[in-house]
């Protein structure tokens, strides 16, 4: 195995004092510091009163694939390479994955210097269940892709965490109301650990209204998982009760679905029609 090694250093989200002693030592002693933004890492070092001892190179998304060979060669020649992103932990929706994978394939030592992460910070501050969760990275930029992505998450039982641009937050929340249901609990975490840190909690309906006026800063969204479904037969029975009272099937399905987060109107409607076919009930709504 090479005598060199790869270090993954978690950097502060906003407060330089959140930097760990191990990160500070690595900044001072690493032979190469591969940074998502070289200006940001130099600014951090200055705030920590540290002189970066090694060579500083950029490692952002568009150049990572081009940097892997040279950085791996340096490690194989005995260098310690430190990877840092702008804020938080490298690799998690930030550069570093390709280099980590290449180092593992080459039998190179990979070590993480743990520390800040917007994902876990938002999760624990959200007030939502945290024993099981999933991280979805950045929400898709385009509306159609975003709605399809949210539709796939509609049945997810775990709490979901994802990043979103402040410019697209309002549109994303409106799509979430449509795909997940407006009653779904959620939290918007803004500017975590910074002077203007803010966590706004409420239903997706409430948060969509809040975001409509515009939001600034770094955004992490946390959304509760889907509630356990009531038995499908019970939901169908509730729909038929509404229908017996004179309500149209589609409207009855909407009413029942709205009362059970995670249940989608169209799926329930299809289930009602299927049940009617199987039991010889009226085929038409």
Curated annotation (Swiss-Prot):
Reactions that this protein is recorded to catalyse: cytidine(1402) in 16S rRNA + S-adenosyl-L-methionine = 2'-O-methylcytidine(1402) in 16S rRNA + S-adenosyl-L-homocysteine + H(+)
One of the Pfam families matching this protein, by short name: TP_methylase
Keyword Disulfide bond: no
Class of the enzyme per the UniProt entry, highest EC level: transferase
Example of a GO MF term: rRNA (cytosine-2'-O-)-methyltransferase activity
CDD domains listed in its UniProt record: RsmI
Keyword Methyltransferase found: yes
Localization, UniProt: Cytoplasm
InterPro entries on file: 4pyrrol_Mease (IPR000878), 4pyrrol_Methylase_sf (IPR035996), 4pyrrole_Mease_sub1 (IPR014777), 4pyrrole_Mease_sub2 (IPR014776), rRNA_ssu_MeTfrase_I (IPR008189), SAM_MeTrfase_RsmI_CS (IPR018063)
Disulfide-bond pairs as recorded: none
EC number: 2.1.1.198
GO cellular component: cytoplasm; plasma membrane
Induction: Up-regulated 34-fold 7 days after infection of human macrophages.
Keyword annotations: Cytoplasm, Methyltransferase, rRNA processing, S-adenosyl-L-methionine, Transferase
Similarity annotation: Belongs to the methyltransferase superfamily. RsmI family.
Protein role: Catalyzes the 2'-O-methylation of the ribose of cytidine 1402 (C1402) in 16S rRNA.
Name of the protein in its database record: Ribosomal RNA small subunit methyltransferase I
Lineage: Bacteria, Bacillati, Actinomycetota, Actinomycetes, Mycobacteriales
């Amino acid at each position: 195995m090479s005598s060199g090694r790869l270090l993954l250093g978690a950097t502060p989200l906003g407060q330089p004092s959140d930097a760990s002693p191990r990160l500070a030592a690595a900044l001072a002693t690493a032979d190469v510091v591969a940074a998502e933004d070289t200006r940001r890492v130099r600014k951090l070092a200055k705030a920590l009163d540290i002189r970066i001892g090694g060579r500083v190179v950029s490692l952002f998304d568009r150049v990572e694939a081009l940097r892997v060979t040279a950085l791996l060669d340096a490690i194989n020649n005995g260098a310690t390479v430190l990877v840092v992103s702008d804020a938080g932990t490298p690799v998690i929706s930030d550069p570093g994955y390709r280099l980590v994978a290449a180092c593992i394939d080459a039998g190179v030592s990979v070590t993480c210097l743990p520390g800040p992460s917007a994902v876990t910070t938002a999760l624990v501050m959200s007030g939502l269940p945290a024993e099981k969760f999933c991280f979805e990275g950045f929400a898709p930029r385009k509306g159609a892709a975003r709605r399809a992505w949210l539709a796939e998450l509609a049945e997810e039982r775990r709490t979901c965490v994802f990043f979103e641009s402040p410019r697209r937050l309002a549109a994303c929340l409106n799509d979430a109301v449509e795909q997940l249901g407006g009653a779904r609990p959620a939290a918007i975490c803004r500017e975590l650990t910074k002077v203007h840190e803010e966590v706004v909690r409420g239903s997706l309906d409430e948060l969509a209204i809040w975001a409509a006026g515009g939001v600034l800063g770094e955004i992490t969204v946390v959304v509760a998982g889907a509630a356990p479904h009531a038995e499908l037969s019970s939901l169908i029975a509730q729909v038929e009760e509404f229908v017996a009272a004179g309500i149209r099937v589609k409207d009855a399905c909407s009413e029942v679905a709205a009362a059970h987060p995670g249940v989608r109107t169209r799926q329930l409607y299809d289930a009602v029609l299927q049940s009617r076919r199987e039991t010889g009930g009226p085929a038409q709504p």
